[in-house]
């Protein structure tokens, strides 16, 4: 990932924290962004997924607009399941590696870390498989995500 992309990702993360009115905390979003870049082999910058459709980015509601948005909805649901297990998915750090065929979780013994890593790896691979429709980026969610 290029340094400029990291700065953009950091700026997005900071603005999302401010917009959500929650105190700053360590997030695994940087790890998730690396998994996304690994899965799509750097073909699309991570920030393209931060405001896509009804579910990619902060929150989510309504009917997903396409396959990529369904990937984000599934990821949101996976994080919700992690929280039901007593995990903190946005704060869980884990060990992973990037192979030629995509990202994988590596040697994770703790249940919460493993669960969250699996959520993130599956989402990253789903993002890489799904078509990206520029028309679904930065949509009016109040109109399209009922």
Curated annotation (Swiss-Prot):
One GO molecular-function entry: calcium-dependent phospholipase A2 activity
Main location: secreted
Active site: 75, 120
Listed CDD domains: PLA2c
GO CC entries: extracellular region
Disulfide bond entries: 38-98, 54-145, 56-72, 71-126, 78-119, 87-112, 105-117
GO biological process: arachidonate secretion; lipid catabolic process; phospholipid metabolic process
Signal peptide: 1-19
Expression across tissues: Expressed by the venom gland.
SMART domains linked to this entry: PA2c
Catalyzed chemical reaction(s): a 1,2-diacyl-sn-glycero-3-phosphocholine + H2O = a 1-acyl-sn-glycero-3-phosphocholine + a fatty acid + H(+)
Propeptide: 20-27
EC identifiers of the protein: 3.1.1.4
Keywords: Calcium, Disulfide bond, Hemostasis impairing toxin, Hydrolase, Lipid degradation, Lipid metabolism, Metal-binding, Platelet aggregation inhibiting toxin, Secreted, Signal, Toxin
Family classification: Belongs to the phospholipase A2 family. Group I subfamily. D49 sub-subfamily.
Summary of the function given for this chain in its UniProt record: Snake venom phospholipase A2 (PLA2) that inhibits collagen-induced platelet aggregation. PLA2 catalyzes the calcium-dependent hydrolysis of the 2-acyl groups in 3-sn-phosphoglycerides.
Record protein name field: Acidic phospholipase A2 S4-30
Annotated source species: Austrelaps superbus (Lowland copperhead snake)
Organism ancestry: Eukaryota, Metazoa, Chordata, Craniata, Vertebrata
